[in-house]
Amino acid sequence: QFIFHHKDDPCRYTYHRDAARLSEKWGIKLVTVRGGTGFRGDACQAFTQHGFTGREEKVALAIRHLVETGAVDKNEID
C-alpha cells in the first residue's frame, strides 16, 4: 500500500502532515508530490494541488510503475 499526496495540498481536510502521520502510523510508504501549474477553483477540488494539477502525467506514471512492479522508484515527484 502507498499514499500519494501533494506537499502543498490546500484542502483543509487533507493536509500533507496528516498523510505523513498516517503513513508512519500504518507503515505505508508516502510518495510526496511537489510543484504543478494552473491551479484554479476550490481548494478541495481536482484543479489544485489536491488533484495533482500540472503533475498528472508524472503521478500517473509513478502509479503505473507501482501497479506493474509492486514498488515505487522514488519518494518524491517534482
Identify the role of each PLM range.
Residues 7-11, 36-39:
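Solvent-exposed loop/turn segments at secondary-structure junctions
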Residues 2-5:
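Short beta-strand/loop motif that positions the catalytic acidic residue
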Residues 27-78:
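C-terminal catalytic histidine-bearing segment of alpha/beta-hydrolase fold enzymes
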Residues 8-30:
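Short alpha-helix in the alpha/beta-hydrolase fold that links the catalytic acid
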